[in-house]
Regions:
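S-adenosyl-L-methionine
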Residues: 155-199
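Conserved beta-strand signature within the Rossmann-like core of class I S-adenosyl-L-methionine
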Residues: 234-242
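Conserved SAM-binding loop of SAM-dependent methyltransferases across substrates and taxa
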Residues: 137-149
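A short glycine-rich, Lys/Arg-flanked "PGG" loop and its adjoining helix->strand segment in the class I
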Residues: 219-233
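Conserved class I S-adenosyl-L-methionine
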Residues: 126-137
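Class I S-adenosyl-L-methionine
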Residues: 243-280
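Conserved alpha-helix/loop element of class I SAM-dependent methyltransferases that forms part
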Residues: 110-128
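N-terminal auxiliary segments of SAM/dcSAM-dependent transferases
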Residues: 1-90
């Protein structure tokens, strides 16, 4: 799917453009792609010009919502297919996303992109073949590509999340020159697709599943046994667990995960907000 290259608006950025025009400015300099680049945007009574194309002034925009040009109007980047999936702006530039109002990436202390970079560094991706089990917005894959990964194979179960990626300038484009053919991105349920991955075929694994209550199969012993099967001896696995409240959940999910990974054939320890494991 081709990636969108038009303007992305928030209520704040649209208001900033309007104020600049109302003060008599003929143009405005800044970012309309969530901080990925800086542009000079021409302003007039009818709207603004971005990268050679004219756009009308948007109507009233909502807070905590990103808008893209759909060919006729500025539309929110959200879809409903049983669940409401939405791309959400952050103060850091790189957006997060929500499913039914539940934030899927941490953003309170640092950018979700920088958070992904810290985790990717744990598996030392340079030159390696990596399995990225739950692609999401692709921040693990993007950071691995930046770090010189040899090849990364990524799965995403939700077609609407894949659509979000095409509108997010922070998500990697498998067809881009910078990816260089190293990112293989597939629509599929990794709990099933893992059975087709050859044994001893990957050097490292990045596993960022939804929380246990949504995707328990991705925390199962059966799935961990498959991860142990496909990764080579000495290979590193980072498993995101988050830090669920033990008092309210009654469970210590990180330690449960570590115990199952040990049983599957890894040496596991708690790291960041998850578990780092090495195949024995």
């Amino acid at each position: 799917m081709p990636h969108y290259t038009g303007p992305l608006l928030t209520r704040d950025s649209a208001d900033t453009l309007r104020r600049a025009h109302d003060k008599g400015a003929a143009d405005w300099q800044g970012s309309l792609d969530l901080g990925r680049s800086q542009d000079t945007v021409a302003l007039d009574a009818d709207g603004f010009h971005f990268r050679g194309q004219a756009y009308p002034w948007p109507g009233k925009l909502k807070d905590r919502t990103l808008y893209y040009w759909d060919g006729e109007d500025f539309a929110p980047i959200s879809r409903y297919s049983g669940s409401l999936i939405k791309l959400v702006p952050t103060e850091w530039g790189a957006p997060t996303f929500e499913i039914d109002g539940i934030k899927m990436l941490p953003t309170s202390k640092l950018s979700p992109f920088e958070d992904a970079r810290r985790k990717v560094e744990l598996v030392a991706p340079a030159g390696k073949i990596i399995l990225d089990t739950c692609g999401g917005l692709g921040y693990f894959a993007a950071c691995a590509l930046e770090a010189g990964v040899g090849q990364i194979r990524s799965f995403e179960k939700n077609a609407d999340v894949m659509w979000l990626r095409t509108l997010n300038p922070w998500s990697p484009d498998p067809d881009s020159a910078s990816a260089g053919g190293r990112l293989q991105f597939s629509h599929g349920d990794v709990s099933q697709q893992i059975e087709q991955v050859a044994s001893n075929s990957v050097d490292a694994i990045l596993h960022d599943p939804p929380r246990f209550g949504i995707a328990g199969e991705l925390y199962s012993q059966t799935f961990y046994d498959h991860l142990a099967r496909v990764i080579r001896k000495g290979g590193r696995l980072f498993h995101y667990t988050g830090a669920p409240n033990k008092l309210t959940s009654g469970r210590d999910v990180p330690r449960e995960v570590a115990k199952r990974l040990e049983k599957a054939g890894f040496k596991a320890e708690l790291a960041l907000d998850g578990v780092l494991a090495v195949k024995r």
